[in-house]
Design a protein with these regions (language model features):
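Beta-rich interaction/scaffold domains
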Residues: 1-48, 99
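Extracellular/surface recognition and adhesion modules
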Residues: 29-32, 53, 78, 94, ...
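A short, amphipathic beta-strand motif
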Residues: 49-57
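Structured interaction patches on ligand/partner-binding surfaces of diverse proteins
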Residues: 95-118, 256
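Collagenous Gly-X-Y triple-helix signature in extracellular proteins
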Residues: 117-342
Length: 342
């Protein structure tokens, strides 16, 4: 026989190597026997043809090819696998209660990521904030939205302030649902305050006044119709100051300050492990900030406690050509430029 043994992925499904009948006779219906005249039998389990999709949890996933249709629902992790009965290209439709997206998929290819979302303008600033929020929360942010793009937001008490994209897929959502598509930050400093009521840093970022009170109330700066859309992300910071070996703790923050390494990619005065540098701050000129009420260069708080004393947190100081980390007593007042994610 020309073909008398079938293997799939290294597993023998049919073996007729002892067959004495010719291929031509088999084609005319003759039964295969071995040299002893015993009937040769084989079994063959056809492999399942599947289309695997990662999408929004609860989305309806439908594959269509001609008159054939197969549907399923994405589980809580956003996974859906459809079993189809034919190879080739199928049209995939994924729908939520608000959005629908379609794509062609070939059976047997890798898992397809397909998220229904709003119709976005490729220019970030041309979209309204509701569309930006929806794109983030459906994970359909266009590739054309780049780090460094900005859009104006009406900030309570500070007027119209530019908001910058400082990172894409940088921060982890606190609920474990993956990466926040965008991390945003006010371009100008919008508030002036203390890290703590006393000049100490033993409480670290987790328990300082800036986090527990100022940042906890900072959603007031966001327009009222967007506040509920701000999502908590995980931030890592030294548990205390005055120690180069302080444990790094993880907090869940909706509004947060950046660490030394997230801005400067250094740990000159902070412990390692407080995140990684945002793409935006790889451009040195972006490290300079002014306040909403002035054109003068502002010193702005970082959330990193200083590792070499028990009294200070770090500030970002811009010396005219580049930024550097400096120290400031915890009960000193400096400017803040909070960041957040939708």
């Amino acid at each position: 026989m020309a073909v008398n043994k079938v293997e799939i992925n290294g597993v023998v499904k049919l073996d007729l190597t002892q067959d004495t009948v010719t291929a031509a006779k088999l084609a005319h219906g003759e039964t295969a026997h071995d040299a002893r005249g015993e009937l040769i039998t084989g079994t063959m389990t056809a492999p399942q043809l599947q289309i695997a999709v990662t999408t929004s949890a609860g989305a309806t996933v439908t594959a269509t090819k001609g008159s054939k249709t197969v549907s399923g629902t994405a589980d809580a992790s956003g996974n859906c696998t459809l079993t189809v009965d034919e190879t080739g290209t199928w049209m995939l439709t994924v729908s939520t209660d608000k959005y629908t997206v379609t794509a062609d998929v070939t059976v047997g290819t890798n898992t397809l990521e397909l998220y229904p979302g709003p119709a976005c303008d490729p220019v970030f600033a041309n979209n309204d904030w509701a569309t930006i929020v929806a794109a983030c929360q459906t994970k359909t942010v266009p590739a054309s939205w780049k780090v460094g793009d900005s859009k104006v937001m009406a900030v309570l008490g500070a007027g119209d302030i530019q908001v910058d994209i400082i990172g894409k897929n940088h921060d982890d959502y606190a609920d474990g649902s993956g990466k926040a598509p965008l991390t945003l930050q006010f371009h100008k400093c919008i508030d002036y305050g203390k890290m703590n009521s006393s000049s100490e840093n033993s409480m670290g970022w987790k328990n300082c006044t800036m986090r527990t009170t100022t940042m906890a109330n900072a959603l007031k700066w966001i327009p009222a119709d967007l506040r509920s859309s701000v999502r908590a992300v995980k931030k890592k910071t030294a548990s205390k100051g005055n120690s180069s070996t302080a444990a790094v703790t993880t907090t869940s923050d909706k509004m947060f300050l950046l660490s030394e390494v997230e801005v400067l990619n250094t740990t000159s005065q902070s412990v390692s492990g407080e995140g990684t540098q945002y793409e935006y701050y790889k451009t040195v000129a972006n490290q300079k900030k002014v306040s909403y009420s002035s054109t003068s260069t502002a010193n702005w708080w970082l959330r990193s406690p200083r590792k070499t004393d028990a009294t200070s947190f770090l500030i970002l100081y811009f010396n005219g050509t580049k930024g550097s980390a400096s120290d400031s007593y915890s009960n000193n007042s400096n400017w803040t430029a909070p960041a957040f994610c939708f």
